[in-house]
């Protein structure tokens, strides 16, 4: 069952909402879902349902709350897409990292948390998953077509958390030069698994013109394999 209306204390004051989806047994390892640039939209709730069907607790915080509660955009509407891109340009990654840290603390204190706490992010959320991996406050990090990695390559050396990143070789946000830089930096760290797919940006969202069922199936299978190896809270680097 999808639960809305949760409220999480933010660092520095304020509160933000989150969507929660429990597995059939009512508890399990927690996977935070970090949104695309389009907010907590139907795709994010689809991801929550998928995770719950696999035995995980899905928890998706509203990372745009500083601009207003419950903001979401339709990626297939040109006007809304432009607004989402504008919000992304103004978004501060450090705010997202702080909110995900607060979400980890919230999740770890709840009776539904039985195991570790991981993060899966898409697009903007993929970039945040990379930052969380570098900060080391989740037990597992997965990013789908994260943006801007080539601007923060030095962070790759800091990653000790088991991490996995799924990228498309046809992603228009990632140049050929950036692909090589990302590959070199990520493959130098054994904690990071990097996978490239013959696909474009947003290949895992069914409503995207770049949707690739084959890439999505493979990426999701690899993600689940990593999540099922996740260690309990407090065991990073052990």
Swiss-Prot record:
Monomer. Disulfide bonds: none annotated. It catalyses: 2-(5-oxo-2,5-dihydrofuran-2-ylidene)acetate + H2O = 4-oxohex-2-enedioate + H(+). Its EC number is 3.1.1.45. Belongs to the dienelactone hydrolase family. Coiled coil: none annotated. One of its GO terms (molecular function) is carboxymethylenebutenolidase activity. It comes from Pseudomonas sp. (strain P51). One of its GO terms (biological process) is catabolic process. Carboxymethylenebutenolidase is specific for dienelactone and has no activity toward enol-lactones. Pathway: Aromatic compound metabolism; 3-chlorocatechol degradation. The lineage of its organism: Bacteria, Pseudomonadati, Pseudomonadota, Gammaproteobacteria, Pseudomonadales. This is Carboxymethylenebutenolidase. The active site is at residues 123, 171, 201. It comes from the Bacteria. Keywords: Aromatic hydrocarbons catabolism, Hydrolase, Plasmid, Serine esterase. Ring cleavage of cyclic ester dienelactone to produce maleylacetate. InterPro entries: AB_hydrolase_fold, Dienelactn_hydro, Dienelactone_hydrolase-like. The keyword Endoplasmic reticulum does not apply.
């Amino acid at each position: 069952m999808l639960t809305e209306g949760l409220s999480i204390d933010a660092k520095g004051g304020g509160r933000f909402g989150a969507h929660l989806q429990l597995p059939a047994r009512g508890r399990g390892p927690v996977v935070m879902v970090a949104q695309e640039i389009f907010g907590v939209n139907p795709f994010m709730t689809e991801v929550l349902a998928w995770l719950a069907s696999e035995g995980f607790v899905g928890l998706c915080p509203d990372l745009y709350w500083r601009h207003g509660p419950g903001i979401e955009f339709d990626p297939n509407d040109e006007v809304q897409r432009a607004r989402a891109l504008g919000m992304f340009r103004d978004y501060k990654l450090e705010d997202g990292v702080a909110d995900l840290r607060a979400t980890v603390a919230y999740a770890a204190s709840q009776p539904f948390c039985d195991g570790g706490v991981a993060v899966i992010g898409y697009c903007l959320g993929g970039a945040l998953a990379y930052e969380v991996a570098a900060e080391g406050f989740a037990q597992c990090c997965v990013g789908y077509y994260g943006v801007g990695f080539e601007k923060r390559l030095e962070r790759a050396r800091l990653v000790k958390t088991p991490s996995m990143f799924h990228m498309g070789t046809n992603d228009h946000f990632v140049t050929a030069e950036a692909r090589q830089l990302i590959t070199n930096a990520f493959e130098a760290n054994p904690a990071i698994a990097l996978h490239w797919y013959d696909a474009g940006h947003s290949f895992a969202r069914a409503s995207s013109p770049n949707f690739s069922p084959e890439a999505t199936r493979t990426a999701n299978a690899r993600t689940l394999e990593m999540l099922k190896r996740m260690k309990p809270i407090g065991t990073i680097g052990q």
